[in-house]
Amino acid sequence: MKSVLLGLILLLAGVGFPQVGRAQTPAAPDDKPATQPKKRGGIFTMYAMDPLSRTLCFTDGKEGMAFVNNKWENRCSDLSYTQAGNGSLVSGIELNRMATIVDLGTANDLRGRYSFEDAENGGVGFASLRLEGGKVTILQDDNGKFKASWQPLEESAKLFAESKSSANAPIQLGHIYLVRITDSRDKSFQQIVKLLVIAYRPDEAVTVRWELL
């Protein structure tokens, strides 16, 4: 099973990351469609040695793998934590999914590059990242009671560059990342997420704050 192969390779910290399809679990006749809205963000910890929560699903903010009828299957794996490369975030690991990951540096790095006002290790940069007109923008100036102004994010070009399967980036505590996921068969599909690494224990776990753009 491709999902099992994916998990085993992630567990062994391999270099290559084969793609895996999402498991389709038949619904019982009395099951009703979920009425909860799509989750827009949250905090999630991925554990290197946990077969379920080593991946994250951006649709509901839950663990990407599942035990189904005594089988280990992929449920919805949009982001993975692997020990490869001394600890990496990996995306574009499902069947037909492609991705790009861009490391924006720390909150202080963004403040320095884009010259907006923010506290030391503050949240202005992360909070202000947004999608506008097919590009990512960041705060330029907050005029208080007047309308804030925005500026293009220079790294947006890298985000919208050609995506690839199993895109990866080294994990850095306190760094902000942008992840863009596309589908090689469904050209209309696109998912863009911003991440902040808020805790990291190498070889064990990484905790991220994430939010859909």
Question: Which ranges hold each PLM region?
Answer:
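Positively charged n-region of N-terminal signal peptides that target proteins for export
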Residues: 1-4
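Hydrophobic helical h-region of N-terminal Sec-dependent signal peptides
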Residues: 6-14
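C-terminal segment of classical bacterial N-terminal signal peptides
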Residues: 13-22
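Surface-exposed, beta-sheet-biased, low-hydrophobicity segments with strongly acidic/polar composition
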Residues: 24-213
